[in-house]
């Protein structure tokens, strides 16, 4: 018997022994913790009862349930966002401790594939002592900044790896995708004189320079006012 082991598989083999005077017998006690067993020590009492139903003897064994770390990462809000060149965008996600013991989780940004000029950082790099089945929402924890000269429609993928402090090989990832918005900025300028004299029905010509100072290809149309 023991508290909290109702779903464990505890089996004595055999369950009954017949012994002569001074005879010694043995039985095998197999114990299998269930899949949701919490890590730690669990004492199990074994009671033998004579055929009179009243005379008993007892002892106990202890089972140490090993820690099995696990975690789950879920996005909060969108994991795909747009950003203006030179600006920042923020991402949020939720972390749940799916293991069988209190655990601490470490966060790290994978910068190995980060394009030149881009920046990615975390406002928090550790979740301390998260209980079993507890979760925490990390709001705006991942910060991604596009370079000033980022071209329109360029997409950058940022991966955050979260690993168990107990066993770093147990990890999960969060992936964000950031796309640069197009900045439309046509600039007009007069080449040469901006004022010319003309007689009635005499043509004069102006040269107008137009420059695309935006960050992407642009179809620019001209119109006359006045």
Language-model features, listed with the residues they occupy:
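Long beta-sheet-rich domains in secretory-pathway and surface-associated proteins
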Residues: 1-226
């Amino acid at each position: 018997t023991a508290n909290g082991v109702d779903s464990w598989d505890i089996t004595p083999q055999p369950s009954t022994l017949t012994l002569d005077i001074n005879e010694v017998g043995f039985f095998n006690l197999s114990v299998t913790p269930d899949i949701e067993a919490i890590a730690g020590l669990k004492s199990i009492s074994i009671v033998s009862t004579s055929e009179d139903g009243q005379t008993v003897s007892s002892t106990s064994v202890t089972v140490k349930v090993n820690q099995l770390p696990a975690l789950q990462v879920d996005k909060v809000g969108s994991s795909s966002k747009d950003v203006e060149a030179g600006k920042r965008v923020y991402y949020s996600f939720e972390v749940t401790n799916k293991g069988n013991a209190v655990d601490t989780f470490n966060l790290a940004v994978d910068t190995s594939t980060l394009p030149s000029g881009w920046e990615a950082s975390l406002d928090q790099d550790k979740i301390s002592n998260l209980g079993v089945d507890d979760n925490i929402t990390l709001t705006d924890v991942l910060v991604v900044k596009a370079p000033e000269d980022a071209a329109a429609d360029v997409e950058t993928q940022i991966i955050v790896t979260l690993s168990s402090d107990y066993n770093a090989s147990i990890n999960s990832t969060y992936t964000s995708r950031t796309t640069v918005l197009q900045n439309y900025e046509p600039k007009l300028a007069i080449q040469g004189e901006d004022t010319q004299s003309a007689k009635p029905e005499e043509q004069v010509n102006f040269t107008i320079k137009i420059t695309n100072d935006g960050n992407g290809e642009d179809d620019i149309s001209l119109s006359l006012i006045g």
